Amino acid sequence: IRQNHQDEPQYGQQVAPIDQRVQRLVMALVFAAKSDGHIERKMRSIIEQNMREAGISEQGERLVQQAIDQPLDPQLLARDIQNEEEALELYFLSCAVIDVDHFMERTYLAALGHALKIPQDVRDGIEQDIREKKQSITD
């Protein structure tokens, strides 16, 4: 079938609309990346590459730009969270993206954890796990 569509460059790419969860994850990724006041070109390239690899490059690029244009608002991310798993997923992703080396990043994570209503001890555990995983990668 693919051979019959060789002259159609869009064939095989995802064309279904991106669901709300993916939109929220992209926004969380971008918000975390810009939590220190700006988003680095390298980080934006990594995000866009991941969108392409997921087969959502065109829609993904729009989502990334929309998230960049949004004010950094943890309440916006937390607004439509339906369950504990979604809240933990957003917080984990945000912690994985951020290397806390600036007070603005720490403040953002604290505000996000509060907006998601994640208890402090759970947040501390997630952050510790992420630090250990990052450390094991660099060793």
UniProtKB/Swiss-Prot annotation:
A Pfam family: DUF533
The protein's name in its UniProt record: Uncharacterized protein in ampR 5'region
Source organism (scientific name): Yersinia enterocolitica
Cited Gene3D superfamilies: TerB-like (1.10.3680.10)
Protein family membership: To E.coli YebE.
Source species taxonomy: Bacteria, Pseudomonadati, Pseudomonadota, Gammaproteobacteria, Enterobacterales
